[in-house]
Amino acid sequence: MKKRIACLLSFLLSLYTCTALARHQQLMHNVYDTQESQSKVNEILSAVSFHGNELSYGERIAEISSRFLGTPYQAHTLIGSSLMQERLVTNPSTVDCFTFIDYVRSMAHASSWQTYVSELVKTRYTNGMIDFTGRKHFFTDWAVTSPRNAQDVTQDISPYTITVNKRLNQKNK
């Protein structure tokens, strides 16, 4: 009986490993980046790792975001629409206000290029699926869709707030 359980566990572990590897390969195939992008991310991650575990999360955010000072602004850097397949773009050499936040948050949770890419998917897309309709197009999406990357503190700031649910510019296929 123990031998059967061990074989079953071994099989399940192998299956999980193969599935995870296939998902990682599919993810990396769908990444739109450049050697310059990888170099910049690795440079920032290296600078942050220099401090080891001494930095709080807020200090990590401050350290990473300071590395973007002087980075040129560029709108419409992401690839994907209702007519074009979504690609995971990572180009920290030019940012808009949203990609800046995506990159900083993702780097704050990463220790390598691979973990950065995984974190970017979790940050930018609902349920980690690279898809235009699942992209978090609005900052409020960070507080209400999984995984949650932000917390709505509006009611903590003022007792006079009201909640109004509206469907604004919902992206469709």
Predicted feature residues:
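N-terminal signal peptide c-region/cleavage motif recognized by signal peptidases
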Residues: 15-17
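Acidic/His-rich structured neighborhood in mature extracellular/periplasmic domains
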Residues: 68-173
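Cationic-aromatic interfacial patches
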Residues: 24-99
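Positively charged n-region of N-terminal signal peptides that target proteins for export
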Residues: 1-4
